[in-house]
Design a protein with these regions (language model features):
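N-terminal cap/lid segment of alpha/beta-hydrolase-fold proteins
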Residues: 46-80, 272, 278-314
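Short, surface-exposed "cap/lid" segments of acyl-processing enzymes
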Residues: 78-108, 114, 312-342, 350-351
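Catalytic histidine neighborhood in serine/cysteine hydrolases
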Residues: 113, 255-271, 347, 472-487
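Cap/lid segment of the alpha/beta-hydrolase catalytic domain
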Residues: 118-136, 325-327, 350-362
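Alpha/beta-hydrolase active-site loop
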Residues: 131-155, 358-379, 398
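Primarily recognizes the serine-hydrolase "nucleophile elbow" in alpha/beta-hydrolase
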Residues: 152-153, 157-218, 383-440, 445
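The feature captures the conserved acid-bearing segment of alpha/beta-hydrolase catalytic domains
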Residues: 198-253, 310, 424-474
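Post-His helix in hydrolase/transferase enzymes
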Residues: 271-286, 488-500
């Protein structure tokens, strides 16, 4: 994607040199949290016909176009970024009060992506009104926003974001967190949370654990997510007359990973900063410390974003997993856990982090070879099961074909989950907006695997997978579940992968 000129007032010395894509110099209307929005106008006017913002805002903010979120504000810290927050406004839009909160977070080293809930709900409404509209996976929208902005502003590495929402935004970010696979977000911070919210007529997918009941006002009343693994902090004013503090306490008490920060002198408007700002900074810092603390890595591979899932099995095999472009999250975590439960230790290479910068097939193969040599020795194993999911599946055949002969001989199986027709060796915005596909073709690389046992797994209705079209006899094929996520049938995936490696023959 070509760079576009013009980027409104990024603070000098920031790590981000230029934004890619469409930029806007529109500024947000200045108001207070909880204050009523200005009179409704056309969507274009909402983005561009605002009052000027304070000078403090122009010292930090740039605006870019971000799909369903419309124009988003991006705030850059003075030094190297330490974390990323995606901040969704209340019904009043991206105004002075939430802008001040964003500035407070940049002082903690955060890049803050500020989104106007009015733009987002308008997009949801449009999607919901289409004939045969499916349920909406709002977690994917927030994840894509984080990916896009971090890539466009030139972040040197990807940071798993914290979700923050005020008022109506507080409810929406809770829903996104409950939907999301583990590892997608660092957690969420909800300021002024109510369980009921109008999602513009959209039905929400359950995802990893979101449940709700529609009420007579056509709102969705969200339920506590008992299985929520990522931390959720309800930041609640005890004088809030819009969202009951007692109701929030009762809601959070049913979620094991939830905390409530009680603010005795605060109402729904969060108007007096001294009554909540210290606690706000502290709550955010707790979420970022939890996710950003680097795990200790073996010296031989300490430059690689690896994740170990040990196991106590006495077998002679381990698994190496190349993740999808979402990183170490969701299916990748669940599959690794299932393999480990069967006695097969697993190490993952986080594709989102590793391919954040461009790689070559040879470079990737060299790094995977380093991982293999390390774990063959460290774990005392003789064979390896190579597994790739989605982005990682596209890359994996290129890697195997470039491994040294001694390592290639120890590959028990190559397992391609959701492989596409083309591979990419750099995470790009096109991968998230569905316009990728210009990379090197995967079919010739799969064919070149020769006598190496290959299992190609696809979901029912998965139109992008090359598995069904591969020549019969050369590659074993298996259809599991539905779609690109295999209906969450992780146990079946693990069972099929292990069975194939131990008895390498075609699977139908």
């Amino acid at each position: 994607m070509s760079q576009q000129p013009g980027f409104a007032a990024i603070r000098a010395g920031a790590v981000c040199g230029a934004l890619l894509g469409t930029l806007s110099v529109a500024r947000a209307w200045a108001g207070e949290p909880g204050q009523a929005a200005p009179p409704a106008t056309s969507s274009s006017a909402k983005l561009h016909a605002h009052k000027p913002t304070p000078a403090a805002d122009t010292a930090y903010a740039a605006h870019l176009s971000a799909g369903r979120f419309g124009s988003v504000a991006v705030y850059i810290p003075e030094g190297p970024p330490q974390s990323v927050a995606v901040f969704l406004s209340g019904d009043g839009g991206w105004e002075l009060g939430v802008v001040n909160m964003a500035h407070a977070l940049t002082a903690l080293g955060a890049v803050v992506i500020g989104a106007d809930i009015r733009n987002y709900l308008a997009s949801l409404k449009s999607a919901a009104q289409r004939a045969g509209a499916p349920c909406q996976m709002i977690a994917a929208d927030f994840e894509s926003l984080s990916h896009q902005v971090q890539k466009e502003i030139g972040m040197s590495e990807y940071h798993v974001p914290v979700l923050i929402g005020y008022s109506s935004g507080a409810t929406v970010v809770y829903a996104a967190l409950a939907q999301s696979p583990p590892g997608t977000f660092a957690g969420a911070l909800s300021l002024g949370f109510c369980a009921d919210q109008d999602f513009a007529g959209a039905a929400l997918c359950p995802g990893a654990g979101l449940h709700y009941t529609p009420n007579q006002q056509h709102e969705l009343v969200l339920e506590p997510a008992a299985s929520l693994r990522q931390p959720w902090i309800a930041f609640q004013g005890q004088k809030d007359e819009v969202c009951s503090a007692h109701a929030v306490d009762a809601f959070a008490a049913q979620i094991g990973s939830a905390q409530v920060v009680k603010l005795p002198l605060v109402g729904h408007g969060f108007s007096v900063e001294r009554n909540w700002m210290p606690q706000f900074r502290d709550a955010y810092a707790r979420l970022t410390v939890r996710v950003e603390a680097p795990a200790a890595r073996p010296t031989a591979i300490n430059d690689l974003p690896v994740q170990e899932v040990p196991a106590m099995g006495a077998g002679d095999e381990f698994a190496l997993l190349l993740t999808g472009d979402g990183g170490w999250a969701g299916l990748d975590q669940e599959l690794a856990a299932r393999l480990a439960a069967e006695g097969v230790p697993t190490v993952g290479l986080n594709s989102l982090k590793y391919f954040w910068t461009a790689r070559t097939p040879a470079e990737t193969a060299n790094d995977v070879a380093r991982m293999l040599r390390h774990y063959f020795a460290a774990w005392g194993k003789q064979r390896v099961l190579l597994v790739g999911y989605s982005f990682g599946a596209d890359v994996l055949p290129f890697v195997v074909n470039r491994l040294p002969a001694d390592l290639r001989a120890r590959v028990a199986s190559v397992n391609l989950l959701g492989i596409d027709s083309n591979a990419s060796f750099e995470i790009s915005i096109a991968d998230w907006v569905g316009s990728a596909g210009g990379g090197p073709p995967t079919r010739p690389e799969v064919a070149a695997l020769g006598n190496t046992p290959v299992l190609c797994i696809y979901g029912e209705g998965e139109t992008d997978s090359i598995c069904p079209g591969l020549p019969a006899g050369g590659v074993a094929r298996a259809q599991i579940g539905k779609g690109h996520h295999f209906s969450g049938e992780y146990a079946t995936l693990a069972e099929r992968i292990l069975g194939f490696a131990r008895q390498p023959k075609p699977v139908t």
